[in-house]
Curated annotation (Swiss-Prot):
<feature type="compositionally biased region" description="Pro residues">
    <location>
        <begin position="56"/>
        <end position="70"/>
    </location>
</feature>
<keyword id="KW-0812">Transmembrane</keyword>
<protein>
    <recommendedName>
        <fullName>Cysteine-rich and transmembrane domain-containing protein WIH2</fullName>
    </recommendedName>
</protein>
<feature type="compositionally biased region" description="Pro residues">
    <location>
        <begin position="9"/>
        <end position="21"/>
    </location>
</feature>
<feature type="compositionally biased region" description="Low complexity">
    <location>
        <begin position="37"/>
        <end position="55"/>
    </location>
</feature>
<dbReference type="GO" id="GO:0005886">
    <property type="term" value="C:plasma membrane"/>
</dbReference>
<dbReference type="GO" id="GO:0009554">
    <property type="term" value="P:megasporogenesis"/>
</dbReference>
<comment type="similarity">
    <text>Belongs to the CYSTM1 family.</text>
</comment>
<dbReference type="InterPro" id="IPR044850">
    <property type="entry name" value="WIH1-like"/>
</dbReference>
<comment type="function">
    <text>Required for the promotion of megasporogenesis, or promotion of germ cell formation from somatic precursor cells. Acts redundantly with WIH1. Functions in a genetic pathway downstream of SPL/NZZ and WUS and together with TRN2 in promoting megasporogenesis.</text>
</comment>
<feature type="region of interest" description="Disordered">
    <location>
        <begin position="1"/>
        <end position="77"/>
    </location>
</feature>
<keyword id="KW-0472">Membrane</keyword>
<feature type="transmembrane region" description="Helical">
    <location>
        <begin position="75"/>
        <end position="92"/>
    </location>
</feature>
<keyword id="KW-1133">Transmembrane helix</keyword>
């Protein structure tokens, strides 16, 4: 059973703005916001003000820490060389087996 040979299920809903029932040139619709919601505007008197910081003092910065001490890099230790040789041997062994 192929889904390509079946008729469409239905007509898609109408697209676009505004939806049916709203006049095209009226936004927001009449009666908005619904009753019970306060009208938006300025905050009430006494609301904490979010102004600029006080002038005359620099803003606080994070403390400055000295850079970490640099470690002297030693020459490669024998452990590194032994690890490389072991990996090389493993690769050769696997290559010989497979």
């Amino acid at each position: 059973m192929s889904q390509y040979n079946q008729p469409p299920v239905g007509v898609p809903p109408p697209q676009g703005y505004p939806p049916e029932g709203y006049p095209k040139d009226a936004y927001p619709p009449q009666g908005y916001p619904p009753q019970g919601y306060p009208q938006q505007g300025y905050p009430p008197q006494g609301y904490p003000q979010q102004g600029y910081p006080q002038q005359g003092y620099p803003p606080p910065y994070a403390p400055q820490y000295p850079p970490p001490p640099q470690h002297q890099q030693q020459q490669s230790s024998p452990g590194f060389l032994e690890g490389c040789l072991a990996a090389l041997c493993c690769c050769c062994l696997l290559d010989a087996c497979f």
